[in-house]
């Protein structure tokens, strides 16, 4: 246990998961150390680009977002979990918090298809993430594009 207050996590995560909620497709949580808790830094819609805009170079953050994946035969909602430790973090002790806290956060945010750890915005490339989601997704009908 990390000793961090995660009470503000479940509600916004439920908003991202809710199919009827068209206003919230992502949430970004910031790690606060005085007192130790996660707080909502940003939430909204707009996909990966808005998630990236909310990530801070000198912060520890967690992001959770909804995306659509699939092929012409089947489109499915997928969820991505990102742990972020910006390259601008100067205190090694703060970076160490990530390894302790990440497991606790994943106990609350436990519905995701892929998990990424990033330290630079260059680590978060839409096409690469889509490929990872597709690989993790199971069925792929793209090989059969003609009907029998």
From Swiss-Prot:
As for subcellular location, the record says: Cytoplasm; Cell projection, Phagocytic cup; Cell projection, Pseudopodium; Cell membrane
Write down the CDD domains for this protein, in alphabetical order.
ADF_coactosin_like
The UniProt keyword set, sorted, is: Actin-binding, Cell membrane, Cell projection, Cytoplasm, Cytoskeleton, Membrane, Phosphoprotein
Boundaries of every ADF-H domain copy:
1-134
Where in this protein would one find the motif F-loop, according to its record? 71-76
- Which residues, renumbered to this chain, carry the PTM Phosphoserine? 147
Among InterPro entries, the record links this protein to:
ADF-H, ADF-H/Gelsolin-like_dom_sf
Reading the lineage from the top rank, the first entry is Eukaryota
Changing residue 75 to A has the effect of: No effect on binding to F-actin. No effect on F-actin stabilization
For molecular function, the Gene Ontology terms on record are:
actin filament binding
Its PTM note reads:
Phosphorylation at Ser-147 appears not to affect its binding to actin; however, it may regulate phagocytosis and motility.
Q: Which GO terms describe its biological process?
A: regulation of actin filament polymerization
**Membrane topology value:** Peripheral membrane protein
Question: Where does the UniProt entry say this protein principally localizes?
Answer: cytoplasm
Identify one Gene Ontology CC term for this UniProt entry: extrinsic component of cytoplasmic side of plasma membrane
What does the record note on quaternary structure?
Interacts with 14-3-3 protein 3.
Q: What does this protein do?
A: Actin-binding protein which is involved in F-actin stabilization. May play a role during phagocytosis and pseudopod formation by contributing to the maintenance of F-actin.
The family line of this record is: Belongs to the actin-binding proteins ADF family. Coactosin subfamily.
Alphabetical list of PANTHER family matching this protein: CORTACTIN AND DREBRIN, DREBRIN-LIKE PROTEIN
What's the protein called, per UniProt? Coactosin
């Amino acid at each position: 246990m990390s000793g961090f207050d995660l009470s503000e996590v479940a509600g916004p995560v439920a908003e991202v998961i809710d199919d009827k909620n068209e206003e919230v497709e992502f949430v970004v949580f910031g790690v606060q150390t005085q007192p130790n808790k996660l707080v909502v830094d940003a939430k909204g819609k707009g996909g990966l680009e808005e998630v990236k805009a909310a990530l801070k170079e000198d912060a520890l953050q967690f992001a959770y977002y909804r995306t659509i994946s699939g092929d012409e035969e089947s489109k499915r909602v997928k969820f991505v979990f990102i742990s972020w430790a910006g390259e601008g973090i100067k205190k090694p002790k703060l970076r160490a918090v990530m390894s302790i806290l990440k497991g606790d956060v994943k106990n609350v945010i436990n519905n995701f298809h892929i998990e990424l750890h990033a330290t630079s915005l260059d680590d978060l490339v839409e096409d690469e993430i889509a490929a990872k989601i597709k690989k993790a997704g199971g069925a792929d009908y793209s090989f059969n594009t003609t009907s029998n």
